[in-house]
Each structure stands twice: as C-alpha cells, then as structure tokens.
Amino acid sequence: MSEALEIPTDIKSRVSEEEWKTREDLAAAYRLVAHYGWDDMVFTHLSARVPGPDEHFLLNPFGVLFEEVTASSLVKIDLDGAVVLDNGYQVNAAGFTIHSAIHGAREDAQAVMHLHTDAGVAVSLSLIHI
C-alpha cells in the first residue's frame, strides 16, 4: 500500500514578511506565464532571489504545472542546490542549473525568467528568418 505524500502548507509562518511577499509575487508571475501560454509544462522556469544576506532563491517545484504554483509550493534553495526550507517538493534540476548560475554571477538579478514562447521557438528553429 502506498502512503500519501504529506505536504506542509504552513510556510508563511516559517518565513519573513519580505520572503512571503517575494513568494506571492513569483507565484503570480507563474500564473501569468501560464495564462499567456508561455509555459511548456515543466521545462520553463522562473526564479526570484530571497531578500536578505544569504544567497537563496525560490524556484518552481518539479512536476507542478505553472497554473498550480503557489507561494507555499515554491522551493527555497541555495546556490549549491541544497533545499533550505523543506516544503515536501522536489527541486527542479533543470531550473536549478540555469538559475543558480545566473543568481551566482549576478547579485543584482532579483528575478530570472526562462521561457519558451511560440515566437522564440519559431526563431530558434529558423522557421522565421530575421
């Protein structure tokens, strides 16, 4: 018999007000990306630097659709990929690779977006010559 995965939902009480606001903003950005059709299931991702002195950032959990992302489901990780605040979700490995490199190199980057828009895909496939 399999056991249900227990996902903590009380993340708000475990983070600062600044981090919670960042979580809300990033979750809203995920929802907007889904609304405009700029997502392609789990292979695009957004991240946001967590306010404060530590080099932590928030990333979508692996396997969660963009329209399902919430402030509590975002995974908080460091630049080495270690989960800083366990919320029961797994790290998006592809997202970590891209976002950790950018956040590590650019302290001024507060948010990073990696998207596959239809227009961008068409250009990358050379279907549209520019």
Q: Which residues does each predicted region cover?
A:
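Long, non-catalytic terminal segments
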Residues: 1-111, 122
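Ordered, amphipathic secondary-structure segments that act as subunit-interaction surfaces
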Residues: 111-117
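Short active-site loop/helix that positions an aromatic residue
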Residues: 120-126
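Conserved small/polar residues in nucleotide/adenosyl-binding loops
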Residues: 128-130
